[in-house]
């Protein structure tokens, strides 16, 4: 008997998932996509299986704006285990070295200012970065170590929350591309004892905070109670991740031409930069960029939600 193909729903929006421990970002995405029965889905930057916390999941038209969330600043809380280093930089790796820990809270607090602001990081071998089409983590698992170029990132916030024995809890606010494992390893080396990430929780992704998230258990319960459509109440608007951008309103006439690819003028447009665009009915219709001549050029358009 031929298998009946599942007809997926055309739904759009963002679900803020509190990613559970042990899930890859893609596994979490596919689980929620199945519960929602969504046609199109994508996430906005990977969290390691060891990590939990804010993972924006984009569905339908919202996937067109996932790159802008990927580029946004992030916030984390991490537990730094001092006295050991591992081959992965976290608790899942093999211990490479064990050293005595002779530092305390005062030593850590005195050191942290060195790691605030613009810093240089060498990405870890256990990362999704690619070399000749191969992810570095696959090369690392095969025992290979390749040279990686240092990259500049910015640490906007770095505070010591707790320190007990050989463990310290840190609060970190950082730019895109920051590796918390590398940050913790570098701090450990500067302390002279080595360190790895024992726990990691993302508390912020762009404008989204942990308090706004929903758990996988809550989504599963909603699905059990009411099916796919019961999850629609957890969907945020497709432009939720762009709330810091100016909103420009177009007349019915201008919106028609803008949606057909033409740059138009708007009286409330800023002088430059990226903007959200809505039509005369206050319906979000896409994002645009204000050019030097003051016109708004369409960059990504969406279908009606």
Curated annotation (Swiss-Prot):
Keyword Signal attributed: no
EC number: 5.4.99.25
Active-site residues (renumbered): 48
Keyword Transmembrane helix among UniProt keywords: no
Annotated GO biological process: mRNA pseudouridine synthesis; tRNA pseudouridine synthesis
CDD domains, sorted: PseudoU_synth_EcTruB (cd02573), PUA_TruB_bacterial (cd21152)
GO molecular function: RNA binding; tRNA pseudouridine(55) synthase activity
UniProt catalytic activity: uridine(55) in tRNA = pseudouridine(55) in tRNA
Keywords of the record: Isomerase, tRNA processing
Enzyme class, spelled out: isomerase
Domain of life: Bacteria
Reported function: Responsible for synthesis of pseudouridine from uracil-55 in the psi GC loop of transfer RNAs.
Similarity comment text for this entry: Belongs to the pseudouridine synthase TruB family. Type 1 subfamily.
Annotated protein name in UniProt: tRNA pseudouridine synthase B
């Amino acid at each position: 008997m031929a298998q009946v193909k599942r007809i997926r729903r055309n739904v759009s929006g963002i679900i803020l998932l509190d990613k559970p421990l042990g899930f890859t970002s893609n596994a979490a995405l596919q689980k929620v996509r199945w519960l929602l029965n969504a046609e199109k889905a994508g996430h906005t930057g990977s969290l390691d299986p060891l990590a939990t916390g804010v993972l924006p999941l984009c569905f339908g038209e919202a996937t067109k704006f996932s790159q802008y969330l990927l580029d946004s600043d992030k916030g984390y809380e991490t537990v730094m285990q001092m006295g050991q280093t591992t081959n992965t930089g976290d608790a899942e790796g093999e211990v490479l070295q064990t050293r005595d820990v002779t530092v305390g809270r005062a030593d850590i607090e005195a050191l942290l200012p060195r790691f605030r602001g613009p810093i240089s990081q060498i990405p870890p071998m256990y990362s999704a970065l690619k070399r000749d089409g191969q992810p570095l983590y696959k090369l690392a698992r095969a025992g290979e170590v390749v040279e990686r170029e240092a990259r500049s990132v910015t640490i906007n916030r770095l505070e010591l929350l707790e320190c007990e024995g050989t463990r310290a809890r840190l609060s970190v606010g950082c730019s895109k591309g920051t590796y918390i494992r590398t940050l913790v390893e570098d701090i450990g080396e500067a302390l002279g004892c080595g360190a790895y990430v024992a726990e990691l929780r993302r508390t912020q992704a762009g404008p989204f905070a942990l308090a706004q998230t929903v758990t996988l258990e809550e989504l599963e319960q909603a699905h059990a109670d009411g099916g796919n459509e019961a999850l629609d109440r957890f969907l945020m608007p497709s432009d939720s991740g762009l709330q810091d951008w100016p909103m420009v309103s177009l007349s019915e006439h201008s919106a028609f031409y803008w949606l057909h690819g033409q740059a138009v003028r708007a009286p409330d447009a800023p002088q430059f930069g990226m903007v959200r665009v809505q039509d005369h009915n206050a319906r979000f219709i896409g994002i645009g960029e204000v050019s030097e001549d003051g016109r708004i050029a369409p960059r990504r358009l969406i279908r009606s939600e």
